[in-house]
Regions:
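Single-pass alpha-helical membrane anchors
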Residues: 1-9
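Short, solvent-exposed loop/turn segments enriched in Ser/Thr/Gly
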Residues: 33-40
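Intrinsically disordered, low-complexity Pro/Gly/Ser/Thr-rich segments with frequent PxxP/GP/PP motifs
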Residues: 59-108
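Asparagine-centered strand-capping/turn motif at beta-strand->loop junctions
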Residues: 43-50
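Short coil-to-beta strand junction motifs in C2/discoidin
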Residues: 51-57
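N-terminal low-complexity, acidic/Ser/Thr/Gly/Pro-rich segments
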Residues: 20-29, 90-95, 149
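Proline/serine/threonine-rich low-complexity linkers at boundaries of modular beta-sandwich domains
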Residues: 8-20
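Terminal connector regions
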Residues: 94-149
């Protein structure tokens, strides 16, 4: 019981002090089936203890409804105390069917996206949000939704 309390305290410290950053969100591909969004992930650990963190699963929503998520991974990282660690790039394939309510707004933008990688998802002008889920020291954590900029 004491062990679980210690682990929960560690998760609370992660929640309060650590910062997960999504860096360089971008459109990487536009196809007939949908579009691919990618972002680089890093974690700041300002605490004095190391953390074991799973690779985050990023979920995209539009208008509060599920659109797509990244593929879960068993990959884990040890985040050293008082450091920023890069966790790599996460890619999410968003099918056009998830964007159907917004297709009239997208039709005019799609030609400008084809063949141009690296554009910000903000170019889509859609109400897209993301949140991530991650295990920290074997305890589950889900972030609050944030608008994709």
């Amino acid at each position: 019981m004491l062990y679980l309390g210690f682990k929960a305290f560690g998760l609370n410290r992660f929640n309060v002090y650590s910062v997960v950053r999504t860096l360089n969100p971008r459109i990487t591909k536009v196809t007939l089936t949908g579009l691919s969004l990618a972002t680089d992930i890093s974690i700041d650990n300002p605490t004095n203890t190391s953390l074991k963190v799973s690779k985050p699963v990023v979920t995209i929503t539009t208008g509060g409804k599920y659109a797509a998520s990244s593929v879960p991974s068993t990959e884990t990282f040890t985040i050293a105390p008082q450091t920023r660690s890069a966790l790599g790039t996460i890619e999410v394939e968003v099918p056009w069917t998830s964007l159907t309510p917004y297709i009239s707004n997208l039709v005019s933008r799609i030609p400008s996206l084809i063949g141009k990688t690296g554009q910000s998802p903000a170019a889509l002008d859609l109400p897209m949000e993301y949140y991530y889920t991650v295990y920290v020291n074997d305890l589950f954590y889900q972030s609050s939704p944030e608008k994709i900029a």
